[in-house]
Design a protein with these regions (language model features):
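Short, surface-exposed ligand-recognition loops at beta-strand->loop->(often short) alpha-helix junctions
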Residues: 9-23
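An amphipathic, aromatic/His-enriched active-site/gating alpha helix that lines ligand/cofactor pockets
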Residues: 26-37, 51-85
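A short beta-turn/loop motif at secondary-structure boundaries
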Residues: 38-44
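Short, low-order "capping/linker" segments at domain edges
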Residues: 84-94
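Short, charged/polar surface micro-motifs in flexible loops or helix N-caps
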Residues: 14, 45-46, 53-58
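Active-site-flanking beta-strand signature of metal-NTP-handling nucleotidyl enzymes
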Residues: 3-10, 47-49
Length: 94
């Protein structure tokens, strides 16, 4: 079975950073309880990393976008094209 690796960069507003980090931690623990998932923080960004079965990708993305819609007021836009996230997904090789 093919595994997918997804990396999503998010940039919370400075005054909302801790609130957003708490929200995404709670959401990932709830939604990705059976999958491998990690969160990384930098001074300005939160980066979510998830490994999942390829069959779950479409459903997980739909659920993730719905959750993200509720969090957009806490996030800064990167630019007019990427908006609030910079995502990357592909086949896990190793």
């Amino acid at each position: 079975m093919t595994k997918k690796l997804s990396i999503v960069r998010l940039k919370p507003k400075p005054e909302c950073f801790d609130e957003f980090l708490q929200n995404i931690r709670a959401w990932q623990l709830q939604v990705h309880a059976d999958d491998d998932h990690l969160l990384m923080r930098t001074n300005e960004e939160v980066v979510a990393v998830v490994v999942r079965d390829s069959e779950m990708l479409h459903e997980n993305i739909q659920r993730g976008v719905a959750w993200l819609d509720s969090q957009r007021p806490l996030l800064q836009e990167y630019n007019e094209v990427d908006r609030h996230t910079i995502p990357m997904t592909g086949d896990l090789v190793i």
